[in-house]
Amino acid sequence: MLERIQETAAFLKGKMHTQPETAIILGTGLGSLAGEITEKYEIRYEEIPNFPVSTVEGHSGKLIFGKLGHKDIMAMQGRFHFYEGYSMKEVTFPVRVMRELGIKTLFVSNASGGTNPDFAIGDLMIITDHINYFPEHPLR
């Protein structure tokens, strides 16, 4: 696994014009944030060695480098899911590559529901903990 991570990171380093320390995984509903990224260059997942390819409708399947505001960032437009048949190692592979590239801060977004009656459509929720019901632990 480490060799694959290093191979993928080396490929991306050869394409990168900046050295971002912040990354965003754009989940369902936030893919349009990619339109706010300036000075961007995109790499399709299919072009990246060892990278899985998203099969979810609406996930564009691109890694985007550029600026959001004045900050150099890396963004994943589309991600991979356990329910698509990927192993947890494959699902977490991009995050491991990000770490190898020097990413220090990662924002992960998704569409979600809540049982709290005070929540309204469009509210932002910050996850402080989670329950793992997956048969395969994502941190292995």
Task: List the predicted regions and their residue ranges.
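Metabolite-binding pocket within alpha/beta catalytic cores that recognizes anionic/polar moieties
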Residues: M1-R140
